[in-house]
Amino acid sequence: MLLIAGTLRIPAENIDAVRAAAQAMIAETRKEDGCITYAFAQDLLDPGLIHISETWRDGAALKAHGESAHMAAWRAAAGGLGLGERDLKLYRAVEGQPI
């Protein structure tokens, strides 16, 4: 299992446009084979900061996600929205358990 966690910086004035562009991509991503979780969340104290959390079954599923049409559409739309610093980390997990 692969976990991705991190942040994406967005100009606060573009948050509505980013939200609109991201919604279709997120909805399609959640339907992908191998996608366990996929979420963007706006920071409550810093409106220009988006927290990203992803869980994938394996590397093949993550690779297919990166090559998908909806990710290409997201990258094209996001290019004009002033997306700033991206800080994402990939983690490998053996198993998870409720806490």
Predicted regions located by residue number:
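N-terminal first-folded block
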Residues: 2-36, 40
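Short, well-ordered beta-strand segments in beta-rich or mixed alpha/beta enzyme
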Residues: 2-9, 39-66
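An amphipathic, aromatic/His-enriched active-site/gating alpha helix that lines ligand/cofactor pockets
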Residues: 20, 24-36, 55-89
